[in-house]
Amino acid sequence: MSKKIIDVFKEKEKVNIGYIVAGFPSVDFTKQFLQNLDNTALDMLEVGIPYSDPLADGKLISHASFLASEAGVTTDTVFDLLTEIKDDISKPLIFLIYYNLIFAYGIDEFIKKCKKANIKGLIIPDLPYEEAFEMSEKLRKNEIALIPLVSVTSGNRIKKIVSQGDGFIYAIGSLGVTGSKQVDLPRLESFIKEIRKVSNLPVSLGFGIKNNDNVNTMRKYADGVIVGTSIVDFTFKNDVNYTIQKINELFK
């Protein structure tokens, strides 16, 4: 469990969470952005590790991930960068990474590198439930949260899915991949109520949140709001100051 993530939810009335693809549009851009994270309205940041088959990601994020991979960005590239600049970053960083990458890397070695790079949580979209208990136990020993993903279609599996989770619950507010249209508000409200019945963890809503109006609407229902696709879209300009400005407008 990551105390730093828990503390953010205790301190903030509503938590702003963003997402970037590591190494896109360049490793230097990622470095500069992370070193200026304190100048953004974000309270924590998901860092996506480039992967060739990102099943949860829409076209835009998949394309950014593909371009980063093509440019030679690997899991080790990201670890090296974050370990180098970890003292410059005061806000919690969370990896969004696919299980195949962790498995190929070696689970214990991967967790060891996460701790060294000061990673506070992991979101693993393709983690098999059967592997979640062991993964969660190993992460807890290293004060890293395993953040569970639940969707509006999870139904009576929600309790089972969140049972191994820490930090917060990532509630998927759309029926598709990242960037998809959200489900209607009554269904969303009912979905979050179902989550709260089975867990005391804070709930953050993601997928389909594209603009400031969306952000402010979702704040009425959830403890945190997650924006990915729009932020990755900003990074295509390859301008750190522009990206920060647009993020601050998004979360104002």
Task: Specify the residue positions occupied by each region the protein language model found.
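Active-site beta->alpha loop and helix N-cap motifs at the rims of alpha/beta catalytic domains
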Residues: 44-45, 49-51, 60-125, 245
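Catalytic cores of alpha/beta
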Residues: 27-37, 153-163, 205, 209-225
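Glycine-rich phosphate-binding active-site loops on the catalytic face of alpha/beta enzymes
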Residues: 44-53, 119-123, 128-131, 171-180, ...
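C-terminal helical cap(s) of enzyme catalytic domains, especially alpha/beta-barrels
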Residues: 57-65, 229-252
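N-terminal amphipathic alpha-helix/helix-capping segment at the start of soluble metabolic enzymes
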Residues: 1-20, 86
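Glycine/Thr-rich beta-alpha phosphate-binding loop at enzyme active sites
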Residues: 61, 71, 158-197, 239
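Hydrophobic faces of well-ordered beta-strands that scaffold small-molecule active sites
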Residues: 16-20, 45-47, 93-97, 122-124, ...
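Catalytic beta/alpha-barrel core
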Residues: 70-72, 118-131, 145-153, 158-159, ...
